[in-house]
Curated annotation (Swiss-Prot):
The gene is FSHB. One of its GO terms (molecular function) is follicle-stimulating hormone activity. This is Follitropin subunit beta. Residues 1-20 form the signal peptide. CDD domains: GHB_like. It is found in: Secreted. The keyword Protease does not apply. Together with the alpha chain CGA constitutes follitropin, the follicle-stimulating hormone, and provides its biological specificity to the hormone heterodimer. Binds FSHR, a G protein-coupled receptor, on target cells to activate downstream signaling pathways. Follitropin is involved in follicle development and spermatogenesis in reproductive organs. It comes from the Eukaryota. Keywords: Disulfide bond, Glycoprotein, Hormone, Secreted, Signal. GO terms for biological process: follicle-stimulating hormone signaling pathway; G protein-coupled receptor signaling pathway; positive regulation of bone resorption; positive regulation of gene expression; positive regulation of steroid biosynthetic process; regulation of osteoclast differentiation; regulation of signaling receptor activity; Sertoli cell proliferation.
Amino acid sequence: MKTVQFCFLFCCWKAICCNSCELTNITIAIENEECHFCISINTTWCAGYCYTRDLVFKDPATPNIQTTCTFKELVYETVRVPGCAHHADSLYTYPVATQCHCGKCDSDSTDCTTQGLGPDYCSFSEMKE
């Protein structure tokens, strides 16, 4: 019985104290409306788990702020989209996370939805490698 209690307490400690929010490599689809196709690029973003809770009885006077794994610092990189027409602006700037933390989701710069389109979504039918 003591082993079960120890395992339970250890798992609770691990979940609370050891958030695994860290940098990870992802592939995103970038698209340019003037070029009418998408290309895939590799970048770095934040992923992992953060301690959070969802109360059964919600108090309207107390805001329920959920933490999420999000960037603490980021830089922007620019890539030239190949194959665009000469008159088109073929430069695309995208964010690259350099440091992560568990914090409130900032909807001004991040898709804070529960289930978004995903980083590899392309609104055009053509995807170039």
